[in-house]
Amino acid sequence: MTPDVTLRFERRLQHPNQRVWAAITEPDEIEAWWGRATVDLRPGGAMRIEWLNSDVTMPATITELDPPHVLEIEGEPHGRLRFELEPDGDGTVLRFIARSPVPDDFLSKVQAGWHFHLDALADFVDDGTRIDWPNWPLDRWQAIHDTYYSGELDSERQSSRQAAER
């Protein structure tokens, strides 16, 4: 059995909570940085994400909802995904936590994937940049992946595994 891994990312975005909340909960906005989405925005509601650069689809259930601060969903294949938004002056701190079983040989790909999506989210709220999914920038993802794969983040990988085991 593959053990769960907990990945944590934190970004400070130069936008108010409501703007970032819209980007993570409104289907048209989600498509700009993540994938095609349907959202029944209520506790227990269904959320479905279809990656537009692959054949991956994630049917999920909203497990926690506290607008405009917390959205947590759970589904396969990506497990539990949690977005926490905290007002910070004229901006917002976004904490993204992903917990799912990830084999060691796939971990750097998952890290790079979420890193890429969060970069795309920041670009979208900053200037409206939408990913052209059929022609998405694989070289950008590859550069991020190479950073994770290089081993520079071994201690973070280990602490993620330890946190998941608790």
Predicted regions and their residues:
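Hydrophobic ligand-binding cavity/cleft-lining segments
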Residues: 1-37, 160-166
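Solvent-exposed, flexible loop/coil residues
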Residues: 17, 43, 137
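Tryptophan-centric aromatic hotspots in well-structured domains and transmembrane helices
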Residues: 21-24, 33, 51, 65, ...
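Short, solvent-exposed helix-to-loop capping segments enriched in aromatics
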Residues: 23-31, 47-55, 145
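Hydrophobic-ligand binding "helix-grip"
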Residues: 38-41, 48-103, 165
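Terminal "cap-and-tail" regions of soluble proteins that handle hydrophobic small molecules
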Residues: 93, 98-166
